[in-house]
Amino acid sequence: MFLYGGKTDLYNAFGYDAAPWNNDLLFLSLSTAFDPSVPPWQYVSGSENTSISSQGPTLAWHTVSAFNSSFSLIFGGSTGPLSPTLPDNSDSAQLLNPMQPLFITLPEGWAGEPQRRMRHATASINGSLYIIGGETADGSGNLFSTHYLFNPSTPIFIQLPSQNAPPGIMGHAAVILPDGRLLVFGGISGGQLVPFSSCWVLDTTQSNLMWALASIDQSSLPSARSSFAFVLLSDGRILIQGGTDATFEAAFDDGWILDPSRSPMTWTQVPALSQLGGRKDHFAVNAGGQVVFGFGAPSHFSLRPPC
């Protein structure tokens, strides 16, 4: 597992948004067992290793999405207040080969890329990447209601249909199920948290892509939230944990599982996930039947079965 960029605050000296940006590329092997209290992260490249000539920019709230066995697309993100990068330009796309490591800077407008955005979500299937929503990186707080498909074989960014699509949204989840359905849920839209009774669906297996709303059982729902961790489990269910409110001040500790195979789809709370504590902007990864959680605010590292 590779992790790139983000924010660090070793001495808790900054507010969350003001914490320093970084360009660190880290690696953690998930092929062997390890003690989650001392995870064996390897520092691959970044400002602390100037012997590596190929390095990426400082970034936060971006995405890194693998589209084949060698390369990933870095897209969007905030470069920080001291960066010379213009936040409204369409120049955020980069290619990364983490094994080298090799960062490839691309020209503005490459492959018809859209404007830089942050706090968006991406999901991939069969080499294609879906980029959903996001917030402008210029501090205005404006949200994007335009969503894109990135086809790396051409390469080209293609705007997805707007009819019945998610509105301007950020801090949400985008997950592609084994059957090819893309689900989008949670986050913030119009200054309000999006309730988990809303879930947008796009069947990526169809040649004519069309958005629809999923049917969700209303009897048991997580409280609305943004910036939560989410992961697709091996059995096709989706796990979420933590997150924050619309002001980004709270840090929730509860966890839930969505079963999209049922009609209507159902949410079930998993009490054990509250042991992780409250956190936001963290990650969750499925590793051989267990879920690895890490980082976020507040930050620590944990390993839990998916329940």
Placement of each model-derived feature along the sequence:
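Kelch-like beta-propeller repeat domains
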Residues: M1-C307
